[in-house]
A protein has these predicted regions:
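Gram-negative outer-membrane beta-barrel domains
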Residues: 17-169
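Cleavable N-terminal export/targeting peptides
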Residues: 1-26
Length: 169
């Protein structure tokens, strides 16, 4: 009986790894850097910063997540300079291939604009956009996205084309 029990335990131990599955792609916490082209009020420049997010697979090909970005910009002209930019967004993604995710996002944004002879003004708005994320390795990714921010008080909008790279952990 002991031999039978030992054989059963050994068989279960050998078979257990077969039940283990890799984590769904594009899930978990992520941290990355961003760089891109930024345009506000017919003035353009560069934007740069970082992003932190968390994504969860709700179905084999669908992810939902949240993201926070912290960026700065070189965009300036006519006495106005775009400065610090902080956004919090919800993100939904669809896995096109095991290495490629298409995503859309929408969220809240606040940007500081430095105004000559007046100091600064913080504007809030709605940010939306979409893009692609490519899994270079199971823990590293590169991404490209377009996003638009519509500010309050008829200030207008801001467009950005962003590329990024980061790690999942």
């Amino acid at each position: 009986m002991r031999i039978l029990l030992a054989a059963a335990v050994a068989a279960a131990a050998v078979a257990a790894p077969a039940f283990a599955q890799d984590a769904a792609p594009f899930t978990g916490a992520r941290l990355g850097v961003t760089l891109g082209y930024d345009k506000t009020h017919d003035r353009d420049g560069f934007t740069y910063g970082g992003a932190f997010g968390y994504d969860y697979a709700v179905a084999p090909k669908i992810t939902l997540g949240a993201e926070a970005t912290f960026e700065d910009s070189t965009t300036k002209g006519d006495g106005i300079r775009a400065s610090r930019d902080v956004a919090i967004s919800a993100r939904a993604g669809y896995v096109l291939t095991p290495k490629l995710l298409a995503f859309a996002k929408v969220g809240y944004d606040t940007t500081r604009f430095e105004i000559a002879d007046e100091g600064h003004n913080n504007l809030e708005g709605v940010r939306y956009g979409g893009g692609l994320e490519y899994s270079v390795t199971p823990r590293t990714y590169i991404s490209a996205e377009y996003r638009r921010t519509e500010y309050e008080d008829h200030f207008g909008g801001r467009d950005a084309g962003i590329v990024g790279a980061g790690f999942r952990f």
